[in-house]
Amino acid sequence: MKRVDAILLFFLFSLSCQKLSLSNEKVVIATASNFLETLVTLKKDFESNHDIEIEIRSASSGILYAQILRGIKVDIFLSADEERADMIIEKKLARAGDSFIYAVGKLALWFPGSVCQLSTMSRETAKECLIQSKRIGIANEIIAPYGRAAKETLDSLGLPRTDQKLIRAENIGQTFALGSSQNVDAAFVAMSQLKKLKGSPSYWLVESSSHAAINQKAVLLSQKKAHEGAKLFFDYLKSDDAQRRIS
């Protein structure tokens, strides 16, 4: 009987240690700027069901990639494209099996000021509004996938002398801020950012044929020691509940 009690006590002690270990873990997630608000919502939902703390770092995908290469502590990288996530795998910092497309981005051309206020907008209407615009906000296409998609869209529209009008921000979050403060007449932003605005913003939902697909890939970075909390959140991202919130 004493032996059974000892085994039971050992089992309960092991469970409490495991729970303590998980609760002490902090999962560090590096996310592209366009996904920040959605991730904050997912973080709250996850933390309400798990005794695990989530820390979020946000910047353009290019800057986050560079920081990861320099050795910054990151458990999960949520890139706004496939390219940089795949480069992390190529650098042997993550396994190909620990990655998946968590979202497909939608690009929108937003007219926050008085230049163009329309409830519905076609490609041709958006083109005319861009011609009238003196300042156009865009994320830096070198480091930000949404910026690259915006530049491809501008090229597809065939507008002359557009480069002179471009105001480049470091990431899509800063581009949205330019529009919100009306420091630009037009801004290429993520459609997910416009959903939080009150009223009916004037925008054109850019056709996917105007730019390369914005496939956003998540990677679980390899660790010397298995990080169970990070794995739990990574699996949560794949869940139907999380995907409903993302879409």
Q: Across the structure, where does each feature detected by a protein language model lie?
A:
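Sec-dependent signal peptide recognition
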Residues: K2-L9
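Exported/periplasmic ABC-transporter solute-binding proteins
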Residues: C17-N49, E55-S58, G62, A66-R70, ...
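Periplasmic-binding protein-like
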Residues: D75-S79
